[in-house]
């Protein structure tokens, strides 16, 4: 039986951005609804009233960073209007909406579907970890978490990836665009790795989440790192600058690998006995469970 599509609310300011996001949300898995934009006849979107009116229908949100000012954020948190969220905008290293949000730059939207899955996984896992309850004033969050778990199944996106969306299963052009998007994310990660660790961590999360959910081969991850360092080396050489420090960026690759290893480790449900793992040893890799994202 096919899973029901997840309803993703798009809170964006321009038709071009809406079109770009819809392009990368497969309609076989997601149903996107546009809750903002000039065509809505609104000069300024009221995030609180908009989300409150659609609260029962929304499973996750894709929201533009500039819409999340301090006042809107405080009102959303105060009313318990929390959803799995992907914030589209710059990697600034700070929280725009809530602690479980994920970030994606506008030039990296080819990763959007994978990032939405990761955001839902993170939201559900954190709900279990922090023991949310009605006493916390977050009854609506509990209700959403239960609804997502019911619709996705007990394991949901915690432990099941979609093999049809693995890198090797994508059409050639889509695969190329996804790889180019990942390269841009990795570049952002490296550029801010030593100068702005918080922003770099957001880029790292974005890269690792997509790498995991798209089943990016480890060798391809290494290739992306080597290619990017090579580009930096060529640029430094043209400018007549020293390049010895580039070897320090091996730490970034080790960081990425450590996060990926942790995700695979967490992909094994804690209540599955070792005998169960042994009996499934010969399953195809596409059927292996997966995990929520990890942040440093």
From Swiss-Prot:
Keywords: Biological rhythms. Homodimer. The KaiABC complex composition changes during the circadian cycle to control KaiC phosphorylation. Complexes KaiC(6), KaiA(2-4):KaiC(6), KaiB(6):KaiC(6) and KaiC(6):KaiB(6):KaiA(12) are among the most important forms, many form cooperatively. KaiA and CikA bind to the same region of the KaiB(fs) form and therefore compete. This is Circadian clock oscillator protein KaiA. Residues 162-270 form the KaiA C-terminal domain. GO terms for biological process: circadian rhythm. Residues 153-161 are annotated as: Flexible linker. Residues 2-133 are annotated as: PsR domain, binds oxidized quinones. Key component of the KaiABC oscillator complex, which constitutes the main circadian regulator in cyanobacteria. Complex composition changes during the circadian cycle to control KaiC phosphorylation. KaiA stimulates KaiC autophosphorylation, while KaiB sequesters KaiA, leading to KaiC autodephosphorylation. KaiA binding to the KaiC CII domain during the subjective day yields KaiA(2-4):KaiC(6) complexes which stimulate KaiC autophosphorylation. SMART domains: KaiA (SM01247). InterPro entries: CheY-like_superfamily, Circadian_clock_KaiA, Circadian_clock_KaiA_N, Circadian_clock_protein_KaiA_C, KaiA/RbsU_helical_domain_sf. Residues 2-152 form the KaiA N-terminal domain.
């Amino acid at each position: 039986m096919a899973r029901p599509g997840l309803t993703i609310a798009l809170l964006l300011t321009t038709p071009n951005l809406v079109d770009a996001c819809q392009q990368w949300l497969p309609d076989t898995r997601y149903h996107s609804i546009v809750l903002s934009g000039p065509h809505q006849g609104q000069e300024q979107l009221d995030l609180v009233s908009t989300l409150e009116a659609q609260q029962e229908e929304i499973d996750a949100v894709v929201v533009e960073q500039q819409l999340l000012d301090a006042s809107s954020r405080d009102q959303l948190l105060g009313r318990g209007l929390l959803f799995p969220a992907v914030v589209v905008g710059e990697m600034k290293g700070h929280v725009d909406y809530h602690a479980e949000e994920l970030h994606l730059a506008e030039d990296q939207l080819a990763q959007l579907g994978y990032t939405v899955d990761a955001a839902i996984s993170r939201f559900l896992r954190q709900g279990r970890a922090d023991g949310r309850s009605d006493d916390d004033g977050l009854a609506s969050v509990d209700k959403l978490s239960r609804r997502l778990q019911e619709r996705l199944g007990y394991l949901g996106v915690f432990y099941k990836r979609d093999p049809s969306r693995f890198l090797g299963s994508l059409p050639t052009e889509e695969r190329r665009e996804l790889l180019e998007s990942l390269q841009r994310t990795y570049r952002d990660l490296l550029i801010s790795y030593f100068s702005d660790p918080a922003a770099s961590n957001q880029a790292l999360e974005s890269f690792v989440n997509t790498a995991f959910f798209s089943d990016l081969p480890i060798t391809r991850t290494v290739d992306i790192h080597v290619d990017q360092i090579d580009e930096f080396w060529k640029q430094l050489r043209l400018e007549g600058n020293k390049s010895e420090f580039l070897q320090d960026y091996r730490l970034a690759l080790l960081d990425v690998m450590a996060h990926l290893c942790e995700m695979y480790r967490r992909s094994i449900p804690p209540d599955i006995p070792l005998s169960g793992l042994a009996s499934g040893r010969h399953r195809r890799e596409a059927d292996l469970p997966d995990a929520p994202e990890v942040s440093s």
